[in-house]
Design a protein with these regions (language model features):
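Short A/G/S/P-biased low-complexity tracts
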Residues: 44, 181-182
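Amphipathic alpha-helical protein-protein interaction surfaces
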Residues: 36, 65, 165, 178-181
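GST-like fold's C-terminal all-alpha helical module
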Residues: 85-178
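GST-like domain detector, emphasizing the conserved glutathione-binding G-site
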Residues: 1-115, 129
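Residue-level recognition of oxygen-bearing side chains
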Residues: 55, 168, 181
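Short, solvent-exposed turn/loop segments enriched in Gly/Ser/Thr/Pro and often Arg
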Residues: 19, 145, 189
Length: 189
């Protein structure tokens, strides 16, 4: 997400890779030396070190002179933008990542968590589909950082088969993947 945002804004950056443990997928000690939580992504800029995609994106956008990739604060679209920017991590990521993790283990579908996750997936993706059936982007008529935040989670959901019968969401995802800055960011892996 952060690389995609930097590419959209044409801001130069230096990318530093920290290899995770191949078995545990845990971050290496080198990442903990950058930030005590050792979670990626992390940005280090002018003496400021932040983790969390949403916080990093807001920091980067606040460094821009113009309101690029977010609606004017006085507009109704700004509040839609905020909702979707935070929905990606606040509400949507839990059921999507839980589905991903549960797909990696043997389950019989009767655990309480399975029912909760299934309900949340249905609710969240119905909301997304309804929104995207009415407009091209999450925060109105213009591409914004909220679209970047949402796209990455939707990609994971697509890989898990959670976008079946969600034609507007699938079409949206195709259009996001066609953006040159997305493609450049995706080339980094």
């Amino acid at each position: 997400r952060v690389i995609w945002l930097l590419e959209e804004l044409e801001i130069p950056y230096t990318l530093v890779h920290h290899q995770r443990d191949p078995l545990t997928r845990l971050a290496p000690e080198s990442l903990r030396l950058v930030h005590p939580l050792a979670k990626a992504p992390i940005i280090v800029d002018n003496g400021i070190t932040l983790c969390e995609s949403g916080a990093i994106m807001e920091y980067i956008l606040n460094q821009c002179v113009d309101d690029i990739l977010r609606p004017q604060k006085s507009s109704a679209e700004y509040y839609q933008y905020l909702e979707w920017l935070h929905f990606a991590e606040g509400s949507l990521s839990l059921p999507v990542i839980s589905t991903l993790l549960m797909s990696m283990e043997q389950r019989d579908g009767r655990q309480a968590l399975d029912g909760y996750i299934a309900k949340e997936v249905q609710l969240d993706f119905s909301y997304i589909e309804n929104t995207l059936s009415k407009r091209q982007y999450f925060a109105g008529d213009s591409f914004s950082a909220a679209d970047i935040m949402m796209t990455i989670v939707l990609e994971i959901a697509e890989g898990l088969g959670l976008l079946e019968n969600r034609d507007s969401t699938k079409a949206y995802l195709v259009s996001m993947k066609q953006r040159p800055a997305y493609q450049k960011a995706a080339s980094f892996g």
